[in-house]
Amino acid sequence: MSPCGYYSKWRNRDRPEYRRNLRFRRFFSSIHPNAAAGSGFNGPGVFITSVTGVWLCFLCIFSMFVTAVVSVSPSSFYESLQVEPTQSEDITRSAHLGDGDEIREAIHKSQDAETKPTFYVCPPPTGSTIVRLEPTRTCPDYHLGKNFTEGIAVVYKENIAAYKFKATVYYKDVIVSTAWAGSSYTQITNRYADRVPIPVSEITDTIDKFGKCSSKATYVRNNHKVEAFNEDKNPQDMPLIASKYNSVGSKAWHTTNDTYMVAGTPGTYRTGTSVNCIIEEVEARSIFPYDSFGLSTGDIIYMSPFFGLRDGAYREHSNYAMDRFHQFEGYRQRDLDTRALLEPAARNFLVTPHLTVGWNWKPKRTEVCSLVKWREVEDVVRDEYAHNFRFTMKTLSTTFISETNEFNLNQIHLSQCVKEEARAIINRIYTTRYNSSHVRTGDIQTYLARGGFVVVFQPLLSNSLARLYLQELVRENTNHSPQKHPTRNTRSRRSVPVELRANRTITTTSSVEFAMLQFTYDHIQEHVNEMLARISSSWCQLQNRERALWSGLFPINPSALASTILDQRVKARILGDVISVSNCPELGSDTRIILQNSMRVSGSTTRCYSRPLISIVSLNGSGTVEGQLGTDNELIMSRDLLEPCVANHKRYFLFGHHYVYYEDYRYVREIAVHDVGMISTYVDLNLTLLKDREFMPLQVYTRDELRDTGLLDYSEIQRRNQMHSLRFYDIDKVVQYDSGTAIMQGMAQFFQGLGTAGQAVGHVVLGATGALLSTVHGFTTFLSNPFGALAVGLLVLAGLVAAFFAYRYVLKLKTSPMKALYPLTTKGLKQLPEGMDPFAEKPNATDTPIEEIGDSQNTEPSVNSGFDPDKFREAQEMIKYMTLVSAAERQESKARKKNKTSALLTSRLTGLALRNRRGYSRVRTENVTGV
């Protein structure tokens, strides 16, 4: 047996153990000149000793080894053999030989394992356990679905939009206004407005015939017949003019722009009537079940728009008496803009309490449909799954599910438009896309999908498949002669009579998210199922192929193949057509493994070991077992693996978690696993990833469709009502009412009623009155000026002052006329002494004139001074005669003006009377002195 070698790695060389082990190495280097790489021996270190000493040492060691081997039986060794590698920062693999000299024990302690490798002890199989390879399997064939059919589809939904048509509204706007005329203002005290329907006779004979409308309105209110006239004048036909403002899709015509109102003379009430004939072309809307329709004016007509007198239309709904409804065949309506007659049509007229509405009658079945097209899909795949049809539409990212039975469209009320429209769409798509590559298979098919959708489907078949089917059909007809089969009293699925439910309707959901989720689920399911099916089939085929390979490789290396198949370390051997296996237990923690540094056979120069030599040492004292290192850390309990020695020998062996490198059958160094390149025997599984599917924002019903669901469009009604005043009345025109103008109008009407002569006189009178009114107007205008008002104020103030003084003068004339007329003459009367009687007689009164009284202020008056009674009486007579003279002159003047005899005669008589009364004497003016 060759000497033992060892290798180790040291970090702390100053330790006592290192120095002691170094002595041991020097000792062993004298025994074997070629030290292992990394063992610490730098040279051959040949130490010549005596032959006796060498043999003594060898015999001692060999005897100890033999004793240890003999003392341990194989069975007890396998029972106690375990591996427990030690672990440290720098661990050396060591081997402990149990009881022996301390040199061998030190060598074993110095070799610690670097990591925790797992080693297996594989005893040779004895044939007690045999196995065999499973024969090849039959791989399954998976089908994801059946009856896949491609085609074209048109999807329909419930029609929730209103039926729209044009209607014409005829009415007269009657406004009666009562106004109070003040001195400088006008006030409306009452206003009555009403809409009056226009009779159908006036529409047909006047409006649509001449483009005019009467200014007279006749209507019934409070069960009484009432008439109104525009501007309170005699009725006349007035031309219809277009309105100033029109909304989208609406036009209107009317007869006047003004609202008539009368302002009378101040302090009176006047009433004015305005009649405006209005014709509006508006939009009418009706929703299912079409028993009424609404107008954009806000009015609701409780009659079906399809009510008529022919083709059974009289069965439609109506809430009005028949005398209010009129239908004319071939009626030609007049275009009020171009004045041209339109094409003949069946025209309906309905008279309501407030308006007359007219519209063109059309049959119901040709105008409305309870279903409407939602989407056209050019490529659809239909498959049968779980007794249902699934229509997959990738362009819409949706999947619709329906029953396998076709749906009869005749069950749905007013669904006659679906097949005709769908057929036209399918023909167009087929002609433009599939005409050269596919053929149609049968007629179009109709299915009711979940959610209330109707799918009209046209199956298609590619030309290549069609040719294969034809060839197969020809082959079958050739091989099998035609035989007559007894007819069975059965029907095909499509011809099964279905009990129809009258007037059935469907309700479509407003969201299509459920179909999109169904499409996503089906897409994921299809992808996963297809992937799993391919994996299963490929896996089965791969197993069959690997089985054939393993069957051929088992004779070469049965242990490796058996370990791979059984997923555990075993030892195998071929025994004919079966394989004998034995289990390979792991070494426990109470064992150590020593790797020797030489692979040469001791005593031979041509024989070498093909695997490194090892020694398995039990730490519990059970002994040491010699063997070889097998593949993949397998420990072989024999040293039978030999080979001829070759030159340039280089080998790498896995030992634990590292590779050990041998060159020329000598240990060189240890190599880490990651420093050795790796080639993989595995085949990557190429799987297709799940494709990205984005949800498209699909709308079943658009915003316009949802807005059209109601009977009335309130936005259009509000727009029309707010525009009504702008369309038919001039809101910018202002009429200034004048009381003088009212007087003139009243006088003019009065003179016009007197005939031609009265009108001539009226012109003269109205001219003079107009001049007077103009003067008054100018005066009032002057007063309205601030400066004119100030001047008038000053004049009024001056007039008041003058009036005050005049009033005082008149009072003075009344109380003392002589003082007022002769203030200087009567001035001396104020100077009479107190107590003096002005009428008392005095001596020599005739000699002293009255003017001398009080001539001198220093002369005291005489007690007997006073007035002369005769003079006083003469003065009285003179005043009387002056009054008579004044009266006579006035009478004569009047007589001359009037040229009347009685007045002249009276004047003459008055003069004669005055002449007969001349018995007075003249008052002396000079001073009379006494004789």
From Swiss-Prot:
Entry comment on modification after translation: A proteolytic cleavage by host furin generates two subunits that remain linked by disulfide bonds.
Signal peptide: 1-71
Sequence segments annotated as region (Involved in fusion and/or binding to host membrane): 179-185, 264-271
KW Transport (keyword) present: no
Spans through the membrane: 787-807
Gene3D superfamilies hit by this protein: 1.20.5.1890, 2.30.29.100, 2.30.30.1230, 6.10.250.3280
Chain span(s) of sequence motif Golgi targeting: 881-884
Spans annotated as Hydrophobic membrane proximal region: 731-784, 764-784
Glycosylation site list: 147, 257, 435, 503, 620, 686
Motif mapping: Di-leucine internalization motif: 904-906
Protein name: Envelope glycoprotein B
